[in-house]
Swiss-Prot record:
PANTHER family: 1-DEOXY-D-XYLULOSE 5-PHOSPHATE REDUCTOISOMERASE, 1-DEOXY-D-XYLULOSE 5-PHOSPHATE REDUCTOISOMERASE, CHLOROPLASTIC. It catalyses: 2-C-methyl-D-erythritol 4-phosphate + NADP(+) = 1-deoxy-D-xylulose 5-phosphate + NADPH + H(+). It comes from Synechococcus sp. (strain CC9605). GO terms for molecular function: 1-deoxy-D-xylulose-5-phosphate reductoisomerase activity; manganese ion binding; NADPH binding. This is 1-deoxy-D-xylulose 5-phosphate reductoisomerase. The lineage of its organism: Bacteria, Bacillati, Cyanobacteriota, Cyanophyceae, Synechococcales. It is an enzyme of class 1 (oxidoreductase). Mn(2+) binds at D154, E156, E237. Keywords: Isoprene biosynthesis, Manganese, Metal-binding, NADP, Oxidoreductase. Catalyzes the NADPH-dependent rearrangement and reduction of 1-deoxy-D-xylulose-5-phosphate (DXP) to 2-C-methyl-D-erythritol 4-phosphate (MEP). The gene is dxr. NADPH binds at T10, G11, S12, I13, G36, R37, N38, N128, E130, G221.
Length: 415
């Protein structure tokens, strides 16, 4: 039986991970949970899974959680150890009895707990892509030092990882080196196109929060759904793929695939192309992380290509998706630039969700932060440098929003 810790248990990745644990009680045991402010759901999770430790990001909520657990009958030997704050999250992430840590905390907030798990030698199911995007130069040496294995829990990188299992370089694809995988020529990341894939560039002028958070294929959190609509999510995945598999950015491509059946493809040295297919369901890549290197039989819906009918593909329009171009540029710049770009995007999306800026303002404020950072870019940052520029970028975006955003004309960034 594999003991798992779930960081961000009340979020989209966390809840689906716990559903899998319930479906396979003889395979997985939950030993640690961390959460934000959804105490009602967290108490229900504790009742069902009986973890050894529970951590809250906000330590001020610990007394309320303790009372809620008591009212729910979780007392005495059944009660988990409760810890809070940043230190508490790190304690849960490095929990001694855990074999695998699922990192489902959204955004750069997941960086420090992920590093704590790595330094404790834990294997990771990485759903928090921002960890590598913002701090790849910091994380990769830590992985090498600890011997932790990093398995991708998002659908695209899981697809690449699964395809590599069918090559002679499978052992080299444990995702802990960041060096080029031999024989891997090209990666093609598939994108649904998000909520606005069938909108024209002109239509985006009337985009609302409700529009941007209505994904046609996937069930995900609000922030990542907005990132999907802007194609920033795919741009972030390009940077993550660079760190995971070691390919240069010129060899990592994005292709829009509206059906979301092919989850990504790899091209090998002999020009063969391998792909992983399945219905758009995040539980599949999460399960593979939990069960790897084995595969578990499931009663889940099986793929029927005759039901799908056809698979279509098209190139993304850089003028319509300027965030994609910003991600490529930040990744190519390297150093602290991806951290600045990622933090600026997180803050810009938060401002959009609060209806303080328009959807089309998101790339404008991101680009402004990246431009301001260019003179101060650090090529070989340490952890403190990453955390510092992360906070700087968030502040820069808020200040720009408060001053008022002068939107760039459509296509200006791509040009």
């Amino acid at each position: 039986m594999k003991a798992i810790s779930v960081l961000g248990s009340t979020g989209s990745i966390g809840t689906q991970t716990l559903q899998i644990a319930e479906e396979f009680p003889e395979q997985f045991r939950v030993v640690a949970l961390t959460a934000g402010r959804n105490l009602k759901l967290l108490v229900e999770q504790v009742q069902r899974h009986r973890p050894e430790v529970v951590a809250l990001a906000d330590s001020d909520l610990l007394p309320e959680l303790q009372e809620r657990l008591k009212d729910a009958g979780v007392t005495g030997a059944d009660a988990p150890q409760l810890v809070g704050g940043a230190d508490g999250l790190n304690v849960a992430a490095a929990w001694d009895s855990a074999d695998l840590v699922v990192t489902g905390i959204v955004g750069c907030a997941g960086l420090l707990p992920t590093l704590a798990a790595i330094r404790a030698g834990k294997d990771l199911a990485l759903a928090n892509k921002e960890t590598l995007i913002a701090a790849g130069p910091v994380v990769l040496p830590e992985l090498k030092k600890s011997g932790s294995r990093l398995l991708p829990a998002d659908s695209e990188h899981s697809a690449i990882f699964q395809c590599l299992q069918g090559t002679p370089w499978a052992e080299n694809a444990r995702l802990s080196t960041g060096v080029p995988t031999p024989g891997l020529r090209r990666i093609q990341l598939t994108a649904s196109g998000g909520a606005f894939r069938d909108w024209t560039a002109a239509d985006l002028e009337k985009a609302t929060v409700a529009d941007a958070t209505s994904h046609p294929n996937w069930s995900m959190g609000r922030k990542i759904t907005v990132d999907s609509a802007s194609l920033m999510n795919k741009g972030l995945e390009v940077i993550e793929a660079h760190y995971l598999f070691g390919l240069d950015y010129d060899h990592i491509e994005i292709v829009i695939h509206p059906q979301s059946i092919i989850h990504s493809m790899i091209e090998l040295a002999d020009s063969s192309v391998l792909a992983q297919l399945g219905w758009p369901d995040m539980k599949l890549p999460i399960l593979y992380c939990l069960s790897w290197p084995s595969r578990l039989e499931t009663p889940w819906r099986r793929l029927d290509l005759t039901e799908v009918g056809q698979l279509s593909f098209r190139a993304p329009d850089p003028a319509k998706y300027p965030c994609m171009e910003l991600a490529y540029a930040a990744g190519s710049a390297g150093g602290t630039m991806p951290a600045v770009m990622n933090a600026a995007n997180e803050e810009a999306v938060a401002q959009f969700l609060e209806e303080k800026i328009h959807f089309l303002d998101i790339p404008t404020v991101i680009e402004a932060a990246c431009e301001r950072h260019k003179p101060d870019l650090m090529a070989q940052p340490q952890l403190d440098d990453v955390l510092r520029v992360d906070q700087w970028a968030r502040t820069a975006v808020r200040e720009q929003v408060n001053r008022g955003v002068t939107r760039l004309p459509m296509g200006a960034i791509a040009a």
